[in-house]
Design a protein with these regions (language model features):
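Alpha-helical transmembrane segments and their short interhelical loops
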Residues: 102, 106-177, 230-253
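Short hydrophobic, aromatic-rich alpha-helical segments embedded in or entering the lipid bilayer
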Residues: 2-16, 188-226, 234-235
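Aromatic- and glycine-rich beta-strand/loop motifs that create alpha-glucan
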Residues: 1-35
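Short cytosolic juxtamembrane segments of multi-pass membrane proteins
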Residues: 254-260
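Transmembrane helix segments
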Residues: 45-50, 162-209, 213
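Residue-level recognition of transmembrane alpha-helices
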Residues: 14, 32-33, 63, 67, ...
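Short helix-capping/hinge motifs at transmembrane helix termini and TM-loop junctions
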Residues: 43-52, 74, 128-136, 163-167, ...
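Hydrophobic alpha-helical transmembrane segments of multi-pass membrane transport proteins
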Residues: 36-43, 59-131, 158, 177, ...
């Protein structure tokens, strides 16, 4: 029991450090929040004049779940970059010589990334009444659970990549080749069913597709069966995200152990 308490404290300390770093970086907070808001009201506002409402859902409402997905994607994966920074500045060595398991380090980093993502999701949800989207208490709870699962899995994915990177530049290049395609091929901006066949097949293999679709099942349930509605049943979205979480959690832990 004492050992478990020690590891839990280590997870808390690592997470708390990352959260304090995030709160101090005002430019990072502004940058990560500005991106989805600009896409929502600038791109969404412009496209809503070209795309007719379907099933009572307009284009801005349609992309709102995708903007939540974008917020989670960028916040979670780029939270994992702290491993690269810690390695470059020697702090990672200090953590690794401490009497804590590698598993606790990974969980601490993943919990921090998830917490940062969820804070930003909560801020983004302020726009729900403005957009005319109505959610009840159960939908709000399901939204938090779905967002938390997606955030944890994507942070673990970022840790999986960053644990093998020795420099910030290398991580940034690889992530840009992964993050942007993941976002654009997730159904966040346009329905997967309307994509060209080749891109549609890639989208089916993209775990973010099911994360975004799960959010659509919660927020846009009234548009089910239309092009603006969710693509898959909610149980399929949940199963894929849960599987992705399990796989990335295991692989990120193994990768960090080997690289550390």
């Amino acid at each position: 029991m004492a050992n478990i308490a020690h590891e839990m404290k280590a997870i808390y300390v690592i997470s708390y450090r990352e959260l304090r770093k995030f709160i101090r970086e005002k430019s990072r907070i502004m940058g990560t929040m500005a991106r989805p808001i600009l896409w929502l009201f600038v791109v969404g506002g412009g496209m809503s004049r070209l795309v007719r409402p379907v099933g009572g859902i307009n284009y801005i409402q349609f992309i709102f779940p995708g903007m939540i997905g974008m917020t989670i994607l960028f916040a979670s994966i780029f939270s994992a970059i702290s491993i690269v920074w810690d390695r470059e500045f020697g702090f990672l060595k200090e953590i690794l010589v401490a009497p804590i398991s590698r598993f606790s380090v990974v969980v601490g980093k993943a919990m921090a990334g998830t917490s940062i993502s969820m804070l930003q999701v909560l801020i983004l949800l302020v726009f729900v009444p403005v957009l005319g989207i109505k959610i009840n208490a159960l939908q709000f709870l399901l939204l938090l659970i779905s967002s938390g699962m997606l955030a944890f899995s994507l942070t673990c994915f970022g840790i999986l990549v960053s644990s093998r990177m020795s420099s910030y530049e290398g991580f940034n290049i690889i992530m840009n080749f992964l993050v942007m395609p993941m976002f654009f091929l997730s159904g966040a901006m346009y329905p997967v069913k309307l994509m060209p066949p080749v891109l549609r097949e890639i989208a089916y293999a993209n775990p973010l597709t099911y994360g975004v679709d799960g959010l659509k099942n919660i927020l846009l349930a009234g548009a089910s069966g239309t092009t603006m509605g969710p693509e898959y049943p909610a149980i399929v979205d949940f199963a894929v995200v849960a599987g992705f979480l399990a796989v990335t959690a295991v692989l990120s832990n193994l990768s960090f152990r080997r690289a550390a």
